[in-house]
Amino acid sequence: MVMKAAVDDDASGWELNVPEKMEKSSTSWVDITQDFEDACRELKLGELLHDKLFGLFEAMSAIEMMDPKMDAGMIGNQVNRKVLNFEQAVKDGTIKIKDLSLPELIGIMDTCFCCLITWLEGHSLAQTVFTCLYIHNPDFIEDPAMKAFALGILKICDIAREKVNKAAVFEEEDFQSMTYGFKMANGVTDLRVTGMLKDVEDDMQRRVKSTRSRQGEERDPEVELEHQQCLAAFSRVKFTRVLLTVLIAFTKKETSAVAEAQKLMVQAADLLSAIHTSLHHGIQAQNGTTKGDHPIMMGFEPLVNQRLLPPTFPRYAKIIKREEMVNYFSRLIDRIKTVCEVVNLPNLHCILDFFCEFSEQSPCVLSRSLLQTTFLVDNKKVFGTHLMQDMVKDALRSFVSPPVLSPKCCLYNNHQAKDCIDSFVTHCVRPFCSLVQIHGHNRARQRDKLGHILEEFATLQDEAEKVDAALHTMLLKQEPQRQHLACLGTWVLYHSLRIMIQYLLSGFELELYSMHEYYYIYWYLSEFLYAWLMSTLSRADGSQMAEERIMEEQQKGRSSKKTKKKKKVRPLSREITMSQAYQNMCAGMFKTMVAFDMDGKVRKPKFELDSEQVRYEHRFAPFNSVMTPPPVHYLQFKEMSDLSKYSPPPQPPELYVAASKHFQQAKMILESIPNADREVSRILKVAKPNFVVMKLLAGGHKKESKVPPEFDFSVHKYFPVVKLV
């Protein structure tokens, strides 16, 4: 073993092996073999020396090193060919820059699309899009179709990167924004590129028409093949132009641009079937090179950017297959169409629900970013037109109808009251914008961020209660029959509870909880959070009704005509009903888990370094920053859920019966909801079988078996179907 004792400034000999270096450089080398072996003998068998400089990062790098699946550098050892860059490949004649045949164009375009998608899925540009040599310098390309396509792909990458960076809802596992010094076609305007693509498209369309079969004419197979290939190339060029135009539309501030994007997405969707049916027309990648994970074909070199990659081992990039590419684009188009719908939503609550539902599909980083930038445009206005403060006021009006925001109330034009409410609303803007942004992150990061934002909502809750008290005092002096108690506080509490519920439920989706933890998670949800949520919703509904009564009395005083009373649908009634169903599902699961535990069907770990209390406190740690509702500590939970306080204490069969009643109650509540959506039908698919299983267990079915039950979360992410094994 040889160690360098002095650093040589001359780095020219990097590629030489050690003995040659020793001969050619003036560096003095010291043999440390014996010293190293002596030091090793001091360690016992199995002992390791842990240097303080060797942390988790270095440990992970050591694990990844030389593993072909994790160390991208290993790919170089598997190939014997010479790696050429664009200019070298052109000089060598291994790639064409003019007169590309249609199969070559189609194959290169398809592989470029695959690389683009692999980049959007979190890999680096150097390992994906820039493995296409044509993208390196489109100015050199003489073929008009290839040149326009290369510029189009660069522009798509550039605008997508800008959108994702601006939305800031990505983490290192989602997206790599580095461009490695490549030119992103900044010297050419977006309009010029779309114009070039349109010219190529028109030229292709003329060729498609000229090769089309005419009635009564015998078809030449070669002409038919050319027609199919022209159509395939035309579809791909048009798809590139449409996708680029959609991204350009999203950079405009006008809401009309979203409508334009919607129309273009319909066009893009229509082109996909033509792309799918013509995949076989393109040249295919050679087999047996670099394990087939990265296509080797004319114009592509997976190792060309190997030296640009960072010194830490980058992820091994596996380029997706062409068939998957079409499916991915199809899903992306559907997601972008969904993004366009957000501008039609009337209020902040609907927008928050929309963001939650959109996030549940685990969308890609590009569609998540487009949704964020569509919601809050550069000028910090919602959809580029509404002030966030006005959205907050509308949300308050629709939820609790606070007197201070009613034009018929004396406080509406009171300067002091106006200052109070305006200050509160301004303080609401940041937490609510952050909440919307959180729903743009991937599901795992969302949960972490929801835990942190609770602190901001706790501060807001405190302010809301103070503002409520001040406004109530002002109101009593002028309109004693009216109240302004807990209006703003109720609204903030509602959002805090929703965040807390979402935080706990997402743990099931992310598979964070062990089976033995289910019972206290479901207990906290059913006995505490959903109970608080229903009480909050009922209080908000009561505030709305009280305000409506006052408005009706004022109307009666002015008008002598009798008005027919219509039965009004309460705005919050559906949410109250859904909360009751969720509460029953959680209560049913809690009692099921307790009964399973009593029957010895829940495997518990032998706690050595932690305990149930430690785990419980870890699970609910983010709730400690919230004062309302007050957090339930472990000892409180044990006391409240203790069955021995009942006389006689319930046995497993009684608990199974109680659980079955909860599932039945949830089923009845959900079946009473008109116009049931997908969420309702999903919960019903869990409630019905669970009701039957609980009945069987209550009757003594598989009583002697100690085999743990199975929990199937495939139907619903938060409530499993219980299966007896």
Swiss-Prot record:
Q: Which domain of life is it from?
A: Eukaryota
Which keywords belong to this entry? Cytoplasm
Q: Name one Pfam family in it.
A: Mak10
One GO BP on record is: smooth muscle cell proliferation
Location of the region described as Disordered in the Swiss-Prot/TrEMBL record: 548-573
The UniProt induction remark is:
In carotid arteries, after mechanic injury.
Checking InterPro entries in the record gives: Naa35/Mak10
Return the Basic residues bias intervals: 558-571
Q: Name one GO cellular component term.
A: NatC complex
**Where is the protein found, in the record's own terms?**
Cytoplasm
Which tissues express it? Answer: Expressed in primary spermatocytes, basal epidermis, interstitial fibroblasts of skeletal muscle, and intestinal crypts.
Which family does the entry's similarity section mention? Belongs to the MAK10 family.
Q: What does this protein do?
A: Auxillary component of the N-terminal acetyltransferase C (NatC) complex which catalyzes acetylation of N-terminal methionine residues. N-terminal acetylation protects proteins from ubiquitination and degradation by the N-end rule pathway. Involved in regulation of apoptosis and proliferation of smooth muscle cells.
Assembly, per entry:
Component of the N-terminal acetyltransferase C (NatC) complex, which is composed of NAA35, NAA38 and NAA30.
Q: Would you tell me the protein name for this molecule?
A: N-alpha-acetyltransferase 35, NatC auxiliary subunit
Native species: Rattus norvegicus (Rat)
